[in-house]
UniProtKB/Swiss-Prot annotation:
Gene Ontology biological process terms, A to Z: L-arginine biosynthetic process
Family under the similarity heading: Belongs to the acetyltransferase family. ArgA subfamily.
Misc remark: In bacteria which possess the bifunctional enzyme ornithine acetyltransferase/N-acetylglutamate synthase (ArgJ), ArgA fulfills an anaplerotic role.
Protein name listed in UniProt: Amino-acid acetyltransferase
GO molecular function: L-glutamate N-acetyltransferase activity
High-level lineage: Bacteria, Pseudomonadati, Pseudomonadota, Betaproteobacteria, Neisseriales
NCBIfam families, A to Z: N-Ac-Glu-synth (TIGR01890), PRK05279.1 (NF003641)
GO cellular component terms listed in the entry, alphabetical order: cytoplasm
Originating organism: Neisseria meningitidis serogroup B (strain ATCC BAA-335 / MC58)
Sorted UniProt keywords: Acyltransferase, Amino-acid biosynthesis, Arginine biosynthesis, Cytoplasm, Transferase
HAMAP family per record: N_acetyl_glu_synth
Pfam family, one: AA_kinase
PANTHER family (alphabetical): AMINO-ACID ACETYLTRANSFERASE, AMINO-ACID ACETYLTRANSFERASE NAGS1, CHLOROPLASTIC-RELATED
Length: 436
């Protein structure tokens, strides 16, 4: 595929996700190691692009690794309790200095990301005392000193800024009602802000590719329950990351995504492609199959039209779909329709037919056809069908590889046999015996 064709294909794939995210809130928790050099510039450019696409953005950065480096340079050993930093007065002052410096750098990078365009819209970045904090106190006998936790989030003020089109920038600092300043953990703060705003997505930008399974492979999608199971075998930081992600999901955040922010364009790839690039965690499973309803008809028609034009599927009018929608099941990935299949029944109670099995060209490698077939088989078994037919002009081998055997016209139910003879397609007939 040529470069222009690739661009068109990728842009078309991105459009539904852009539409889905426009006007929605995204909270990003940013590892402080990403806020320097060329990585900062590229991240700022992508953040600016998201803002101009109409996405409401709240950015929270950490300071842990900066503080650890400074402590080591000064011969001091940082102390942690349950993964939270014990923050003395020196560390707090350094965190305040870092917060001011990194905000200035990010503002400059954000301005630079749009400066090459005439009449480029500004991308305002705002901060404020949106977070009220309190001291953590003592944990397991350890005084956490100036380490704090969020007591209250001024959600109304945050929404006011987001409504105005501003990007909200939150440092890892919060102030108490007594006027003291406390250092905040980035993971917890990002999750808390996302819950307060009921954000569509919480994205953690880290230096890892996502959450790994015990065998070392990347877990691309996880339910909250699956993520918690992985946390039991993970290291301390990964365990805290998963814990914050699950807390956000349980608080009403729609999706949590964990990705390598140092990889150029990773944020855009994660948000605007079907499979993403990191680990995406949802409260429930990502791919689901459900009964179709009348509202799905335009999407089903659009999905099967190319296959009808190629002669792979028999043409089905809108009227046909309206009258037979109860036969259809649809497969959704992340809320988007990627496949459909129908189960037709006949007077002969033990016979059924899987029909109109279709998967979007953008999802041919996702195993969705297998899932739809398994769903139809389970559905057929549930209503007492013992023989499931498939009629195909050019996918007979696919069905044969999945337990279907060549059958004769005489084995079709009588009403289906009449249709078969009249439509002139001369489809291959296959049947699979279903065992209870």
């Amino acid at each position: 595929m040529s470069a222009p064709d690739l661009f068109v294909a990728h842009f078309r794939e991105a459009v539904p996700y852009i539409r889905q995210m426009r006007g929605k809130t995204l909270v990003a928790g940013i590892d402080d190691r990403l806020l320097e050099g060329d990585t900062l510039n590229k991240l700022a450019a992508d953040i600016g692009l998201l803002s101009q696409l109409g996405i409401r953005l709240v950015l929270i950065h950490g300071a842990r690794h900066f503080l650890d480096r400074h402590a080591a340079a000064q011969g001091r050993t940082p102390h942690y309790c349950r993964g939270l930093r014990v923050t003395d007065e020196t560390s707090l002052e350094q965190a305040q200095q870092f917060a001011g410096t990194v905000r200035s750098r990010f503002e400059a990078a954000l301005c630079g990301s749009v400066s090459g365009f005439a009449r480029a819209p500004s991308v305002p970045l705002v901060s404020g005392n949106f977070l009220t904090a309190r001291p953590i106190g003592v944990i397991d006998g350890t005084d956490m000193e100036y380490a704090g936790v969020i007591r209250k989030t001024d959600t109304a003020a945050l929404r006011f800024q987001l409504d105005a089109g501003n990007i909200v920038w939150l440092p890892p600092l919060g102030h108490s009602y007594s006027g003291k300043t406390f250092y905040l953990d980035m993971l917890q703060t990002a999750a808390s802000a996302a819950v307060s705003l009921q954000a569509e997505k919480l994205v953690y930008l880290t230096l890892s590719d996502g959450i790994s399974r015990p065998d070392g492979t990347l877990a691309e999608t996880l339910s909250a329950q699956e993520a918690q199971s992985l946390a039991e075998h993970a290291g301390g930081e990964t365990r805290r990351l998963i814990s914050s992600a699950v807390a956000a999901l349980e608080g009403g955040v729609h999706r949590v995504q964990i990705l390598n922010g140092a990889a150029d364009g990773s944020l855009l790839q994660e948000l605007f492609t079907r499979n993403g690039i990191g680990t995406s965690i949802a409260k429930e499973a990502f791919v689901s199959i459900r009964q179709a309803h009348s509202g799905d008809i335009p999407h089903i028609a659009a999905l099967i039209r190319p296959l009808e034009e190629q002669g792979i599927l028999l043409h089905r009018s809108r009227e046909y779909l309206e009258n037979h929608i109860s036969e259809f099941s649809i497969l959704e990935h992340d809320g988007n329709l990627y496949g459909c299949a129908a189960l037709k029944t006949f007077a002969e109670a033990d016979c059924g037919e899987i029909a109109c099995l279709a998967v979007s060209p953008q999802a041919q490698d996702g195993g969705y056809g297998e899932r739809l077939l398994a769903h139809i088989i389970d559905k057929a078994r549930g209503i007492g069908i013992s023989r499931l037919f498939a009629l195909s002009t050019n996918t007979g081998e696919w069905f044969a590889e999945r337990g279907f055997q060549t059958a004769s016209e005489d084995e079709l139910p009588e009403t289906r046999r009449k249709d078969y003879r009249s439509n002139g397609r001369n489809s291959h007939i296959l049947v699979r015996r279903l065992h209870r």
